[in-house]
């Protein structure tokens, strides 16, 4: 068996971290490279030490709760010995206290957290017989239609070296365009699908389009667990998603509403099936090699069935509560009899705290339970158990927040930087992508830079067992990427369209949003909404073109077009645009304005909101991320200028209802209130969600630049 690779210092230079930011008033954070607000109070309280301890331990600390794992105590102890000194003052039993709701988010960890973030067990002294204790449920390989009917075999084991070399040139070197080979509309499901295949030849997956899971080559223990929990019949939508996922195609799926959880159990089933097939194949080949070695046959026998390191599935999630829910699903479908370190996991990832009842339902879902965004945990499957807090190099599945993982990949202490454990990821899952984007998408980009990189060192690696496409740095061509979001944004779209090269193809599922079901038609207010288009040459030029149009056209006529001299709100989605506009108003105009954003201290937030509501502050700047994290109902709004369309269509309705609140209080008249939205043709994706699929192309491409709706 190939032993795991031992890593040393990688000497990676950390990129500029200026964009890794968050809400200082909402969380504990010590900023090192992050931008520091210039005109706002900083909340330097380092607060909850018990939470900090959980952050440390979630990166793999395994020195407690050791019942039933004596065979791995030595390995875990070596891996996490650094934690003993670091946490010796913090790992005392904490007294229980009532749980209260707060939003936890960290963009730059404290020094202690940086210490822990890089602790990855690269000194694995796995018992040579450890693999014999792994998954072996005595199942025979499903041979109903031969190996060619198994998508796992077709995708990972059948592509030849010549084929991969040709595709590598076309896809990675020549950057040939991926043709769209199939578009379908499912009117009854209000859904469309688009299939892209790579240039040249394609991997031909088995033509399985059944609504019965038993028709797919799924391991019996997983299938039985799924049947017990949910039954084997799939809805039409779930069948479409399952077909693409189980055939190892990339998937970009918009699940429309946060209440839709069906897709999660499908990808969890797929991840477990992938792990079990991988481990069982390795075990059976190892047995064959042992038998062959003991025989008198001098002929060489070769099996290439693994990567450089053991982890095969990476699941990125926004919060510990979302991680808790996925782990619960993994346990339910794993078919294991016991779970190691489950109590410890519950203590660190589960919480009963809930947001206030007056918040929107999607907000309560996003921030319920333990909403800390700093974690990274390994999960290992054995014959009868599922082990939580396994060291990364002995894990099968890694669950992490992007920031938690990026702090390991680019730890300030170069000696603690690690990325080899991501070298052999074959299934990448990014769930609740919109929440991750609101935290900081830069961390996702950081992780993507390290996935499937050839390891720096190969200590004790058995190259005779490593697949040639791993050795040849072609793993990216076979890695499956699954991205799930409530609504699509350019950054999320790029994960599959630009950062994935899966030769089995890419499928994008897109909801059909007609004008009747658009967000505009759900507002409930007959208010004047003016959409004004400006010319922009390219997405790169868009920020500059937007700013010039705003200061030259919108701002000079703002007081003239508004029926009121106060109550003017300018909503700005991008923080960088917000800083730009704020600086211009401060240095080049005489506007009496206030500004609130995700960095503003609580005291200033309160003062500014009160001043705006009373009319002392005539104009206010308001950012999308502040609205996401607080969901304020701002009083006193009479005129609303949207510098850009909100990425979340629900925010469009909530912002306009600020004016509805003023109308209800008789502070302004509905006929005199105004909403003006700036957009360019590059905003088509966001525009569709608000005005509908039919209207968006007209607004973006027709001769007229001004459109009014009520």
From Swiss-Prot:
Keywords: Nucleus, Ribonucleoprotein, Ribosome biogenesis, rRNA processing
Locations listed in the record: Nucleus, Nucleolus
Pfam families: Utp25_C (PF06862), UTP25_NTPase-like (PF22916)
Region (Disordered), start-end ranges: 1-150
Similarity comment: Belongs to the UTP25 family.
Function: DEAD-box RNA helicase-like protein required for pre-18S rRNA processing, specifically at sites A0, A1, and A2.
Quaternary state and interactors: Component of the ribosomal small subunit (SSU) processome composed of at least 40 protein subunits and snoRNA U3.
Name of the featured protein: U3 small nucleolar RNA-associated protein 25
Organism classification: Eukaryota, Fungi, Dikarya, Ascomycota, Saccharomycotina
Encoding gene per record: UTP25
């Amino acid at each position: 068996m190939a032993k795991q690779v031992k890593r040393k210092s990688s000497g990676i230079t950390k990129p500029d971290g200026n964009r890794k930011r968050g809400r200082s008033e909402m969380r504990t954070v010590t900023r090192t490279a992050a931008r520091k607000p210039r005109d706002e109070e900083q909340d330097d309280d380092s607060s909850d030490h018990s939470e900090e301890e959980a952050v440390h331990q979630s990166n793999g600390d395994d020195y407690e709760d050791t019942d039933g794992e004596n065979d791995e105590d030595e390995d875990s102890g070596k891996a996490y010995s650094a934690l003993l000194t670091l946490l010796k003052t913090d790992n005392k039993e904490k007294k229980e206290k009532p749980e209260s709701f707060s939003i936890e988010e960290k963009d730059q960890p404290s020094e202690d957290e940086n210490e822990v973030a890089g602790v990855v067990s690269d000194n694995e002294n796995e018992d040579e017989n450890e693999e014999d204790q792994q998954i072996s449920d005595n199942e025979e390989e499903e041979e109903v239609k031969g190996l060619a009917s198994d998508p796992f075999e077709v995708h990972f084991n059948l592509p030849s070296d010549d084929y991969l070399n040709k595709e590598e040139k076309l896809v990675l070197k020549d950057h040939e365009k991926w043709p769209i080979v199939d578009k379908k509309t499912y009117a009854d499901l209000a859904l469309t699908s688009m299939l892209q295949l790579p240039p040249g030849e394609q991997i031909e997956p088995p033509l399985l389009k059944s609504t019965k899971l038993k028709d797919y080559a799924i391991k019996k223990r997983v299938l039985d667990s799924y049947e017990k929990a949910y039954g084997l019949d799939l809805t039409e939508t779930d069948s479409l998603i399952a077909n693409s996922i189980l055939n190892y195609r990339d998937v970009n799926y918009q699940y429309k509403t946060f209440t839709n959880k069906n897709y999660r159990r499908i990808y969890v089933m797929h991840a477990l099936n992938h792990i079990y097939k991988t481990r069982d194949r390795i075990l059976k080949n190892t047995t064959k090699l042992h038998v062959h070695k003991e025989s008198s046959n001098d002929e060489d026998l070769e099996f290439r069935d693994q990567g450089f390191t053991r982890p095969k599935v990476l699941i990125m999630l926004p919060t510990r509560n979302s991680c808790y829910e996925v782990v619960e699903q993994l346990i339910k479908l794993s078919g294991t009899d016991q779970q190691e370190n489950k109590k410890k996991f519950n203590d660190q990832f589960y919480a009963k705290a809930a947001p206030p009842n007056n918040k929107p339902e999607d907000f309560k879902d996003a921030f319920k339970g333990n909403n800390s965004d700093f974690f990274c945990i390994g999960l290992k499957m054995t014959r009868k158990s599922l082990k939580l807090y396994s060291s990364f190099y002995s894990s099968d599945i890694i669950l992490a927040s992007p920031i938690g993982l990026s702090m390991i990949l680019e730890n300030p202490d170069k000696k603690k930087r690690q990325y080899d454990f991501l070298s052999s990821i074959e299934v990448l899952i990014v769930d609740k992508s919109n929440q991750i984007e609101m935290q900081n998408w830069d961390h996702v980009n950081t992780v993507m830079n390290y996935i499937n990189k050839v390891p720096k060192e190969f200590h004790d690696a058995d190259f005779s067992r490593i697949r040639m496409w791993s050795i040849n740095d072609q793993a990216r061509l076979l890695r499956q990427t699954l991205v799930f979001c409530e609504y699509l944004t350019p950054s999320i779209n790029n994960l599959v369209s630009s950062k994935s090269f899966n030769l089995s193809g890419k499928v994008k599922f897109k909801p059909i949003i007609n004008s009747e079901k658009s967000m505009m038609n759900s507002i409930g207010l007959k208010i004047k909404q003016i959409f004004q288009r400006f010319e922009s040459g390219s997405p790169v030029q868009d920020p500059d073109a937007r700013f010039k149009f705003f200061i030259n056209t919108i701002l000079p006529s703002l007081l003239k077009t508004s029926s009121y001299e106060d109550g003017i709100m300018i909503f700005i989605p991008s923080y960088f645009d917000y800083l730009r506009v704020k600086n211009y108003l401060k240095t080049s105009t005489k506007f009496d304005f206030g500004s609130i954003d995700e960095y503003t201290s609580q005291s200033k937030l309160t003062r500014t909101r009160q001043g705006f509501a009373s009319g002392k502050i005539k104009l206010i700047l308001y950012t999308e991320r502040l609205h996401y994290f607080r969901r304020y109902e701002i009083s006193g709004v009479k005129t609303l200028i949207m510098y850009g369309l909100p990425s979340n269509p629900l925010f469009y309705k909530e912002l306009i209802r600020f004016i509805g609140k003023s109308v209800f209080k008789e502070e302004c008249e509905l006929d005199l209130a105004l909403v003006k939205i700036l957009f360019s043709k590059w905003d088509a994706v966001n525009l569709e969600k608000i005005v509908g699929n039919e209207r968006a192309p007209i607004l973006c491409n027709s001769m007229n630049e001004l459109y009014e709706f009520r």
